[in-house]
């Protein structure tokens, strides 16, 4: 308020000085202009009347009154007598006696001399006598000098006043500017109603914003009634809230925290008069943060961290606490896609004006970086070895390597002592741990740093501490490599033995499978029949790749393939064989024909039996399907790895001078491993020779080693065969269902002898018999003749 008053007075003073200067300037100019104007007119008029006469100056009387020509009555231009302005004889010098200066401009002007007036010779000569004896230039009258002095003083006074006024206004402006700067940085001198529009508090149950009155007039007449603003403001500390008594409607609402950089004024006594504004503080570049005026909160319970005042926020983005001036607690970042300029028509415009509040203290305890080593009650965690801050550890090895090793140690639940004992004594450890240790072995530089470290081990991380203990053991990682070989060799040997055994069984079963050979025979004969008359006919053998092409040749119906035909023929052939086994008679076909059951039920049973036999080929050659997934190159690589690891272990055993449990365990292992490896090597060579002979048995000798390709071909053919058998089985069920209906219609013909079942299965045999009977009849007929 005082600042505004001073500004108002300064502006008023400037206006007053400007008006005064204008008035004085106009008055002085009028006087000067009046005097000069009269003199100029008089001189110009006289010169005009007497252009060739020499002027005679009269002392102090050469002052022509302006009203003679300027303010006198205008001459009449009507016809009649009037003053003559034509050139004529110069007037007598004494004629200037009547031109005395007027006493004041308000007096009536002197009359103009007329022709009827008496001659100038009759006037008193005492007035002009002195002037006739002293000719010379006229002197300026004293009245003019006096006016010049007054004008000069007036100009000096106006200029001085203007300069002083400018200096005063400049000083006032500088004082006000410095005062504003101090108020913007430091504490306030008086109360101001510059509170935020939205009032928030920690424990507020009414989440409604209080809008401060923005139309308060600071220079209104009613400012005297609001002079005691400080007396009407009370700062009450209740937990983390401040309350104001400025309006009855906002009495129950907790206010916001004070803006950053400002402190609350001290509460004045209730009956005390309004305090005078203190003098402005000296300007400071950066004043310290103001102390808290409110009383401190009650002492927190033991072990709990003191709460900060104003622990709620509605999205304050400031990095500095508005009360203490200290930086806010650093929280974990939340990565999102920030929108640059949201439109006012969007939903965010309404959300920004909401009344949502959150507990800032709880948020800092959950997502703060500094509280990671404290639990919910603020107490330190009991398991300090697992929850120590990684910033306290000394980092020696790679960060990712240390992290992976620490996770593995916790996952396997293996202590450092157990690992050290196993390395020193040759005990068994998890294979995964040993493999990870070899992969994450420190480099030569890291190992040197670990060896040279002589500080406290607790200052190292779990991974560095573990590796520090390991590098102190002689040949630690060579021991780990040998220990891994000792543990994994038995498993690798078992896998190799199983694979080699599978290959041997597959070769034997494939060569000794009667049904598989029957299939090859059927395919060979069928193919030769189809290739009659071509260069492909009369084949004696074919490669097993041909088996995979049987399903590509389709019949005239577009459904039945050559593979279907071969399978049906094999089923019929196996049905006949099943009949032979049941009759236990292998003497001749005629005996079988006479003793066989020719009923339709028996025929169907034989057909289903043949289908089961063909379907069982897949089960019979199951080892061939397992042998197809074995990689011959993988077998050779595994044997090579075993040989290399065994060589390294033997060389490492030679470098160990002192006897220890690990040295004795390694020596015994190498002795057993040599015997196992020799047997595996011999067995692998024998099995591979058997595989090659089997491939030559079916494919013939080839220039290149096909390896285990034979088993892959047979596996694919068995898959195709199994699919065709399922289709034939489904077709047989449909045929049987329709055959039952036909049997019911032929019950009347049951007395007639049914044809032989072999004729039904093999109609070609019946035709041959009919042909043979006809030939015999012809021979009998021709013989008597």
Swiss-Prot record:
| Disordered: region residues | 96-145, 184-228, 241-329, 730-785
Provide the Gene Ontology terms for cellular component: cytoskeleton; membrane
* Annotated Polar residues bias: 201-223, 745-754
One example GO MF annotation: actin filament binding
| Keyword Membrane attached | yes
What is an example of a Pfam family matching this protein?
A: FH2
UniProt xrefs under InterPro entries: FH2_Formin, FH2_Formin_sf, Formin-like_plant
Q: Where is the composition biased (Pro residues)?
A: 256-303
Can you give the residue ranges of the FH2 domain?
Answer: 321-747
| Compartmental location | Membrane
Q: What is its main location?
A: membrane
Which residues, if any, are the signal sequence?
Answer: 1-20
Keyword set for this entry?
Membrane, Signal, Transmembrane, Transmembrane helix
Biological process GO terms, please? actin cytoskeleton organization; actin nucleation
Family of the protein in this entry = Belongs to the formin-like family. Class-I subfamily.
Name by which UniProt lists this protein: Formin-like protein 3
Q: Organism classification, top ranks?
A: Eukaryota, Viridiplantae, Streptophyta, Embryophyta, Tracheophyta
What gene does this protein come from? FH3
């Amino acid at each position: 308020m005082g600042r505004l008053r001073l500004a108002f007075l300064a502006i008023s003073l400037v206006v007053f000085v400007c008006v005064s200067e204008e008035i004085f300037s106009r008055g002085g100019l009028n006087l000067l202009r009046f005097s000069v104007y009269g003199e100029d007119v008089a001189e110009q008029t006289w010169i005009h009347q007497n252009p060739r006469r020499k002027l005679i100056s009269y002392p102090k009387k050469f002052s022509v009154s302006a009203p003679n020509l300027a303010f006198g009555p205008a001459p009449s231009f009507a016809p009649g007598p009037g003053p003559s302005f034509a050139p004529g004889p110069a007037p007598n010098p004494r004629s200037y006696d009547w031109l005395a200066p007027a006493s004041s401009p308000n007096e009536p002007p002197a009359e103009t001399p007329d022709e009827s007036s008496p001659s100038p010779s009759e006037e008193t000569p005492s007035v002009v006598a002195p002037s006739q004896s002293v000719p010379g230039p006229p002197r300026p009258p004293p009245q003019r000098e006096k006016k010049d002095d007054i004008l000069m003083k007036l100009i000096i006074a106006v200029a001085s006043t203007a300069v002083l006024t400018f200096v005063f206004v400049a000083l006032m402006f500088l004082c006000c500017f410095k005062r504003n700067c101090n108020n913007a940085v430091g504490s306030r001198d008086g109360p101001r109603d510059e509170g935020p529009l939205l009032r928030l508090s920690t424990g507020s149950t009414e989440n409604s914003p209080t809008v401060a009155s923005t139309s308060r007039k600071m220079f209104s007449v009613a400012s005297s009634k609001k002079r005691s603003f400080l007396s009407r403001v009370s700062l009450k500390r209740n937990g983390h809230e401040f309350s104001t008594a400025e309006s009855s409607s906002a009495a129950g609402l907790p206010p916001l925290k004070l803006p950053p950089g400002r402190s609350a004024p001290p509460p004045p006594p209730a009956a005390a008069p309004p305090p005078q504004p203190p003098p402005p503080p000296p300007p400071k570049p950066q004043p310290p943060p103001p102390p808290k005026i409110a009383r401190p909160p009650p002492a927190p319970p033991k072990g709990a961290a003191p709460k900060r005042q104003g622990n709620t926020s509605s999205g304050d983005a400031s990095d500095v606490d508005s009360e203490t001036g200290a930086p806010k607690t650093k929280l974990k970042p939340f990565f999102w896609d920030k929108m640059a300029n949201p439109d006012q028509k969007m939903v965010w415009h309404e959300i920004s004006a909401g009344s949502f509040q959150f507990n800032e203290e709880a948020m800092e305890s959950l997502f703060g970086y500094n509280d990671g080593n404290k639990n919910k009650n603020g107490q330190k965690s009991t398991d300090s070895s697992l929850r120590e801050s990684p910033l306290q550890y000394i980092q020696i090895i790679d960060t990712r390597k240390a992290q992976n090793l620490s996770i593995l140690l916790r996952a396997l639940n293996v202590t450092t002592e157990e690992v050290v004992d196993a390395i020193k004594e040759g005990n068994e450890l998890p294979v995964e741990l040993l493999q990870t240790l070899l992969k994450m072995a420190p480099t030569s530089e890291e190992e040197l740093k670990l060896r040279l470290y002589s500080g406290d081990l607790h200052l190292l991380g779990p991974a560095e501490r573990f590796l520090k203990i390991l590098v102190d053991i002689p040949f630690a990682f060579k021991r780990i490599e040998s220990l891994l070989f000792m543990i994994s060799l038995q498993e690798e040997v078992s896998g190799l033995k199983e694979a080699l055994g599978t290959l041997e069984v597959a070769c034997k079963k494939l060569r000794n499978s009667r049904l598989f050979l029957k299939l090859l025979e059927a395919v060979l004969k069928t193919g030769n029949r189809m290739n009659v008359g071509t260069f492909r006919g009369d084949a004696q053998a074919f490669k097993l790749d041909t088996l995979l092409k049987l399903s590509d040749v389709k019949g005239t119906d577009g459904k039945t393939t050559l593979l279907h035909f071969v399978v049906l023929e094999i089923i019929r052939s196996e049905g006949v064989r099943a009949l032979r086994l049941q009759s236990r008679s292998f003497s001749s076909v005629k005996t079988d024909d006479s003793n066989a059951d020719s009923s339709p039920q028996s025929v169907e049973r034989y057909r289903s039996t043949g289908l089961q036999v063909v379907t069982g080929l897949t089960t019979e050659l199951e080892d061939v399907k397992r042998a197809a997934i074995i990689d011959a190159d993988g077998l050779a690589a595994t044997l090579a790895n075993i040989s290399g690891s065994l060589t390294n272990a033997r060389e490492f055993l030679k470098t160990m001078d002192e006897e220890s449990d690990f040295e004795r365990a390694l020596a015994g292992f190498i002795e057993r491993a040599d015997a196992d490896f020799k047997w595996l090597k011999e067995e692998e060579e024998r099995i591979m020779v058997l595989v090659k002979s089997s491939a030559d048995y079916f494919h013939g000798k080839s220039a290149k080693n096909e390896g285990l390709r034979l088993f892959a071909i047979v596996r694919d053919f068995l898959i195709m065969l199994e699919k065709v058998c399922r289709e034939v089985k489904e077709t047989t069920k449909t045929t049987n269902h329709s055959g039952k209906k036909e049997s019911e219609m032929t019950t009347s013909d049951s007395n007639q002898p049914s044809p032989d079942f072999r004729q039904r299965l093999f109609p070609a045999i019946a035709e041959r018999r009919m042909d043979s009977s006809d030939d015999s009849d012809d021979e009998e007929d021709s013989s008597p003749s």
